Every structure is written in C-alpha cells, then in structure tokens.
Amino acid sequence: MTRIRQVSRPDLHPAAETIFQLIFGDRDPTVDPGTDTGSPGDWWPTFALVPEVFDHAVAGLALYRSSERKLDPQLRELGQTRVGWDVGSRFVFSQHCKSCRTVGISEEKIKSIPNWEESEVFNEIERAVLAYTDCLALNNGLVTDEIFQTLTKHLSDEEILELTYIVATYGMHGIISRALRLEFDADENQSLEEVEGDHQSLSQEHTEKRMEEIVNKEKSGD
C-alpha cells in the first residue's frame, strides 16, 4: 500500500487524462489497479497529486524516448536497468529488464546485469556504461578517469550527457518509488528480481500505436 494518497480518475488534471488512457484505458487504477506489465500502476495516480510533478515526470519519459536522442537505446537501457538494481528498486529494475527486450538486448545480457563485473557477455562500452552507472548511483557521482576515458572513446559529449541525465533521473525514480512504497517497491523485504509480465507494452511502437488510437477516438467524439 502506498504511503500517500492517490488521485482518482475523475479528479485528474487534464494533461494526465491522456496518459491514463494510454496506460489504463477507461479504468480508474485507484479502483481497478493493474497494467500490462504486471505492475499495480499506482505510480501514476500518486504522482498526479501534484500536477506539475506529474507533468515534469512524464516530460522526462518523453525526453529519453525522443528520436532526437543520440545515445544508443541499448546503452541507455543497460544504464536504466542497472541503476534500478543499484538503488534497490524492484520497480525500476523489473520494468527496465522488460524494456531491454524492446530494444533488442539479449536474455543473457539482461540476466547478467546484476553481476556484470563477473560476466563476459558485455563489450567494452557496455561495461563502461555499467561501471559509470555504478559510480553515479553508488559513489555519489565520483567517476574514475579510467572509466570516463573509456566512455569518451566510444561516446560523444552529447551522448555522455544524455546517459548521465537519464541514469540519474531513473536513480531518482527508484528512490522515490521505494520511499513512497509504490508499485513493486511496496514491500521493502521483497527480493530484487524481475516480476513476470508483458514487455511489448513498453515498446516505442506500442506507445505510438496507442496514442494514435486515443487521438482518433478523441476526434471521433467516442
């Protein structure tokens, strides 16, 4: 159970309604919880308590999925998944294990993220991204020159900034989720592992298709 109250569907601010339609259809998750990925879905009505916070968070989701991003989506997802593990958020870790599949990361690599240092499945830049993520989340941002030099060997300055911003943002989301006991972080004694559920709904293609359906529905007045 979440530690603070949630906003019911009829009381949402207008900008949130489209997002709720995308994720929940016509359901009110405070009454009928659940998402396609198997999560309760209480993150959304909790964040909706403060409309500006909700809108800011949603804008962050749109930012990392934007076609304007230079960073390889696979490197991004490795960082997002690992930072969920680092901060102990089952929600972030589980959701991004699923998201890894939508960008073509192999099951072998996904299963190796928790123990990446002992694994041989990651290449040089992937290992650097995972090491950099650990520095951001576990070492308060202190990064060795060796790790950073490996990043600069493979990534542009723009890509490094995108990686840093996105990973740090998802570290924050994991911390918030744990503090407020949202989603899969409701039980602080749970094991840190992926929760079974569909991953296709997290793909960019699925999101674009659902948004098109919602826009067409609004235009038709249904």
Where do the language-model regions lie?
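C-terminal end-helix/capping segment
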Residues: R101-S106, S177-E208
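Secretory/endomembrane lumenal or extracellular ectodomains immediately following the signal peptide
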Residues: M1-L71, E193-D222
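Short alpha-helical scaffolding segments that buttress acidic/His motifs in well-ordered protein cores
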Residues: W44-F47, A57-L61, L78-G84, I113-P114, ...
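Short amphipathic alpha-helical segments at helix boundaries and their inter-helical linkers
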Residues: D32-P33, R90-C97, E117-Y132, L161-E183
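Histidine/lysine/aspartate-rich catalytic loop segments that bind and position anionic ligands
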Residues: S99-N123
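Conserved alpha-helical segments that form or flank metal/cofactor-binding pockets of metalloenzymes
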Residues: V53-H56, E77, V83-E108
